[in-house]
Amino acid sequence: MGWLRRCYLTVASEFSWRVPGRPQRLLGAFALAERGSMLDMFAAVEATKRRDMRKKYFHHGLDEGRHALIFAERVRAFGLLGRAEAALEDSGQLLEAGIVGGKTLFERMGEPEFLAFVYVAEADAVEQFNVYLERGLPDDATQAQLRAILKDEVFHVTYSRTEVDKYRKDGLPMDATLRK
């Protein structure tokens, strides 16, 4: 992680986790993002022609669903969302869960670009969660959950990077999608 990104994450983390009400909203956003990722992964299971990737996408989708539940539970522990508000958020999320013009993220991007997207997003999450943990944010229970989730995130980063590297070796121009 570059020093500028680390500085940004450190400052943003302090604000996001220490301002009253912000931790709940941040955890809620994480829960929704993880649920959307779960749907993307299950769509990839159906769309890929690569049998070796089906198992990885399926495992990844199960992880994302579990993470969504963990983050939603942390939101409830903080006491933010009432049932009516949660239902409204859920309905909006289901309408916006990666389906654009009737196509999933995997269908719009194709497998190589999808894997590059997954790699970048998962690597960002690992960096972000590590900054939170280094700063001792926000509380012990959430930190324990982040540590558990990080184990899955490392798997996601590893398999997606391995696949991106295979596409590179096959001559596909992956650098445009990946940050250096």
Q: PLM features: residue spans?
A:
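Non-heme di-metal
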Residues: 1-180
